[in-house]
Structure formats: structure tokens, C-alpha cells
Amino acid sequence: MASKERVGVVIRNPQEKTVIVAVNNRVRHNKYSKIIIRTKKYQVHDHSHICKLGDEVKISEVKPISKTKRWIISEVLSSTVNPEKFGD
């Protein structure tokens, strides 16, 4: 079974090896057919401190690292994204 991957933006850097990544998902409303953007936040393990606020990153699902962390940073895609558009 392949691990799940998501692309999102780093919106917070609260602890030493943890970052919060916001991932946007576009879904169509069943009744009104309007496209809705849903945002989900993931706590992601950043062991080597490669992420900064606003970086666009790819995250991969792994076995549980702690109570709430089940994702790690796979790669940093770009560092020019504005984190304000994802909200906090």
C-alpha cells in the first residue's frame, strides 16, 4: 500500500521539530454545485528544520510519531507562498 501524500503551506512553526501545514481541498457541493475550498491542518514532523513559514511542502503519511503527528516533510517545493491566504 502506497503512503498518502499531500501538498500544503506551512502556516505555523510552534515547536522545535513540528510545523503546522494547511492543505486546501476543492469539493463540489452536492445540492448547489458550487466549488467549495476546504482547508485541513496537519501537524507535521520536521526533523531537520528545513521548513520556514510560508514554504510550500509535500508531506507523506507515516506510522504515528506522537499523539497527533502522523505526517513528515517529504520535500520543500517552493518558499515564495504567502501563508495569509490559508488562514490560521
Swiss-Prot record:
Give the GO cellular component terms, alphabetically: cyanelle; cytosolic small ribosomal subunit
Q: List the GO molecular function terms.
A: rRNA binding; structural constituent of ribosome
**SUPFAM superfamilies reported in the protein's UniProt record:** Nucleic acid-binding proteins
What superkingdom does the record give? Answer: Eukaryota
* Keyword RNA-binding listed: yes
Which keywords annotate this record? Cyanelle, Plastid, Ribonucleoprotein, Ribosomal protein, RNA-binding, rRNA-binding
One record GO biological process: translation
Principal subcellular localisation of the protein: plastid
Q: Which PROSITE patterns match?
A: RIBOSOMAL_S17
As for subcellular location, the record says: Plastid, Cyanelle
Q: Which Pfam families match?
A: Ribosomal_S17
Sum up the protein's function in the record's words.
One of the primary rRNA binding proteins, it binds specifically to the 5'-end of 16S ribosomal RNA.
Query: Which protein family is it in?
Result: Belongs to the universal ribosomal protein uS17 family.
Q: How does it assemble?
A: Part of the 30S ribosomal subunit.
Q: State the name under which the record lists this protein.
A: Small ribosomal subunit protein uS17c
What's the encoding gene here?
A: rps17
